[in-house]
Amino acid sequence: MNTVCAELKSIRTVTDLCIFLRVAGLACALFLGSLTVHAQEITWPQFRGPDSNPVGAHARLADRWSKTENVEWSLEIPGRGWSSPIVTGGKVFVTTATTEGKSKPPQIGTEYSNEYVAELQKQGLSMDQILERVTARDIELPKEVKLHYFLYCLNLTSGKVEWQKEFYTGQPPGGRHRKNSFVSESPVTDGKFVYVYVANLGLWAFDMQGKPAWNTPLEANPIYLDFGTGSSPALIGNLLVIVNDNEKQQYIAAFDKQMGKQVWRTNRDIGGKGQPVQRSGWSTPFVWRHALRTEVVTIGPGEAISYDLAGKELWRLSGMAATPIPMPFAYGGLLYIDGGRGRPLFAIRPGAAGDISLGKDESSNAYIIWSQARAGTYLPSPVAYQGGVYVLTETGILSRYDAKTGTMTYKTRIDPAAAAFTTSPWIYNDKLFCLSEEGQTFVIATGEKFQLLHVNDLDDMSLASPALVGERLLIRTEHRLYSIRRQRLAAGAGTPSTK
C-alpha cells in the first residue's frame, strides 16, 4: 500500500512538473513575443518606418498636441534638412546642413515655379531668360553657398544631444529648389551602425557612439533644373541600396554595409521613347519581401522597375509621372505604386515578370489587380490601414480607396484653409494624421466616411515625415524636433519638459 501511495505521489509530482513546465514555457514564449513586439515598436530604422507603411501600434500614442501640450521634449536643430528622424536602441538620428552666409528661405505652398514660368512666358521672354529668372528667384546654386553637413544623435527619452558629427564641409554637389533642402535623404540603420546618404556626394557609416566606420565618395551628377535630391537609401541584409536618377546616367547600386565597397551597379535608362525628357527622380526604393522572393521596387521618370538582389531587372511598369516622388509600399499581400501627380494608383500582385504595363483602356491585367486613373499624388506617399488606402495630394485633397478592389469610398478637401502638404500621412488608433506645411496636423477618423476630428498646431513649417516609436511621435519642423508623448497623470507631476 505504501508503495502504491509513493508511486501515485510520484506521478502527481511529475504531472505537476509537466504542467509547470508547459505554463512556464508558454509564459516565456509570450514574454519573448512581447519583447519582439516591443523591439519593433521602439525601432524606426528608415524613412516611413520598418514596413514603409507608417502605422503605429501603441495604444498610448497621443492624438492631441501643440507647442506645449503633450510635448515630452523639443530641441532646436541648427540649419535645415527635410530628412526624417530615425530611431534605434534609444537613440534618435537626424541630419541637417548649415549654410555660411545667407540662404534662400523655403517657401510654403503649391507654386513650384510652374506658375512663375507661365507668367514669364506670357511676357514673351525667351527660354533662356525664363530660366535665368527662375534660377535667380527659386534656385540656390552650389557656387552660392558653403555647407556644413551634420549627423546628430539624440537620447530618445530626454532629447539631449549625445553626439554630433560634421561629416562634410564644402560646396554641395548640386543646387536646390528653395522648396527642397541640401539634405533631404533620410539615414537608415541596422541597429549597429547608422548609414548616411547624400545623393551625388557620398555614403557614410557611423557606429552608435559616433565613430566613423567608412566613407564612400560618389560622383556628382546633374539634377533637373538643380532642384536638389531626396531619394533615401534602403538596407537589405548586408547590402545598402541607393537609386540615383539624374540627367547624366541613372543607376541603382548596392554597397557592402560593412566596408562601403560597391557590390553591384545597374545603369538605368528610364522612360525610353515617348517618355519624359527629364531623367531625374526623387522616389525612395522599397524592399518588397513576399512569399515568392525579395525584390527592390523603384519608381523613375515615366516607369517603375523592380530588381532582384543582384541588380537584375525583374519587371517594369509604364505610366509614372515625369517627376516621381512617392514611395511604393506593400499591404495585405499587394504592392501599391503611386504613379505621381495626374497618374494612376496601382495595386500589384507578387511574382510579376517582364513588361506589365497596361494596354489602352485597360485598368488591370495578370499582375495589376486594379488601378485608379489620376489617383496619384505629387509629394505625399499613401498609407494603408484596415482595408483602406488613403491618398493625400499636395493641395489637401484626401481620398480613400478599398485596398482590394480600388473602389473609391470618398474624396474631399481636408480644409480650405490648409495651404499645402508635403509630409506623408500616418495612422494609429483609428486616426489618420495629415501634417500641413504650416505645421497643422489634421486628425481624421479612419473608415469609409470622412470625419475631421480636430487640428493640432506647432506653428512652424513642416516638410519632413515623422517617426512613430512606441508611445512617442517624433515630428520635425523647420526649426525643431518634437517628441510628442501623452502625458502620464501622476501625483505631483508637472508639465512635460521642453529642452
Residue ranges of predicted features:
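N-terminal secretory signal peptides that target proteins for export/translocation
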Residues: M1-F20
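Bacterial N-terminal signal peptides
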Residues: C18-S34
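Noncatalytic, solvent-exposed loop/strand surfaces
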Residues: H38-K499
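Sequence-pattern detector for short linear motifs
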Residues: R12-T15, G25, D51
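Generic low-polarity alpha-helical segments
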Residues: M1-T3, A24, E166, P328
